Amino acid sequence: MILIIYAHPYPHYSHANKRMLEQARTLEGVEIRSLYQLYPDFNIDIAAEQEALSRADLIVWQHPMQWYSIPPLLKLWIDKVFSHGWAYGHGGTALHGKHLLWAVTTGGGESHFEIGAHPGFDVLSQPLQATAIYCGLNWLPPFAMHCTFICDDETLEGQARHYKQRLLEWQEAHHG
């Protein structure tokens, strides 16, 4: 099962993430958990989230890039749900062998994330990748949709279909 952990503080304003979710919903075996809808007060149901994760083979963290990082509720979710003794540490093997895909949208162009004037995309992903590895997850190459503020509808739809294709390819490779 593919579990999409969707974290967008302003989902009604996101054309890119909305299209990505619409495409993902057309696949079988996909569950979407919208953190800002489930936990507007940031009071996370840790047991429910761990139960959802236990059913997943692929975990997707989908969100907009915010100040070169993840939204605050996703950070809190990781801190609370990936707990010692469950996700890491003594006896913490619940996530071992599962896969993690970072699916992120950005307002800036791809060149904005090259090494030089701005941090490279590989640099920005390091904390998430390190978290994945520390918890025994298999880190997958990220999916990034850039220039979402200025993309036309056709481009957004094409990128959303590419996202769906990434998920489908993973399903076919791991579940035939």
Curated annotation (Swiss-Prot):
SUPFAM superfamilies per UniProt: Flavoproteins
GO biological process: positive regulation of potassium ion transmembrane transport; potassium ion transport
Catalytic activity from the UniProt record: a quinone + NADH + H(+) = a quinol + NAD(+); a quinone + NADPH + H(+) = a quinol + NADP(+)
Chain positions recorded as FMN binding sites: 8, 14-17, 65-68, 105-108
Keyword Cell membrane: yes
Compartmental location: Cell inner membrane
Coiled coil: none
Cellular-component GO terms for this entry: plasma membrane
Keyword list, A-Z: Cell inner membrane, Cell membrane, Flavoprotein, FMN, Membrane, NAD, Oxidoreductase
Essential cofactor(s): FMN
Highest taxon in the source lineage: Bacteria
Enzyme Commission number(s) from the entry: 1.6.5.2
Catalytic class of the enzyme: oxidoreductase
Pfam family name, one: Flavodoxin_2
Any GO molecular function: NADPH dehydrogenase (quinone) activity
Record flagged with keyword NAD: yes
Family annotation (HAMAP family): K_H_efflux_KefF (MF_01414)
Function, as annotated: Regulatory subunit of a potassium efflux system that confers protection against electrophiles. Required for full activity of KefC. Shows redox enzymatic activity, but this enzymatic activity is not required for activation of KefC.
Record family assignment: Belongs to the NAD(P)H dehydrogenase (quinone) family. KefF subfamily.
Subunit description: Homodimer. Interacts with KefC.
Record's protein name: Glutathione-regulated potassium-efflux system ancillary protein KefF
